[in-house]
């Protein structure tokens, strides 16, 4: 699948929030408490936009926003795994707040976000990518596995508490 991506702008916020609400509804439908208690919210995404950390993938036909993720740097909570350890001590990027609009599910736009994550890491000269999720988020964990992320352990991250942690070392 060919796709375009770019940094999000403040003009994208309403479209981004549609993807977020679609993802929130899917998590709830699957019995996953992740994203059910006010996080992430509109202001979190506005902050990501202002910090130039929020990326959007555009649909190949209409060029509207199909999926979204934040790509950030150092994460203090990642230093405090209570089980396991990271593969490396390299500088790293983290992907957070992954969401795909309902009408684009199953069309490769979640995979596209991981391709963006890897490409951004390589462009920035980063050797390690890290990501976490709720232990019951099977769709996201499937993508971690598909893209070669390795399970490293568990950590406590608010607001969902217990998180599973993964890392991918870039070539």
Regions found by a protein language model. Give the residues of each.
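Conserved acetyl-CoA-binding loop-helix of GNAT-fold acetyltransferases
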Residues: 100, 106-119, 142, 146
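Hydrophobic adenine-recognition pocket in adenosine-nucleotide-binding enzymes
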Residues: 8, 98-100, 133
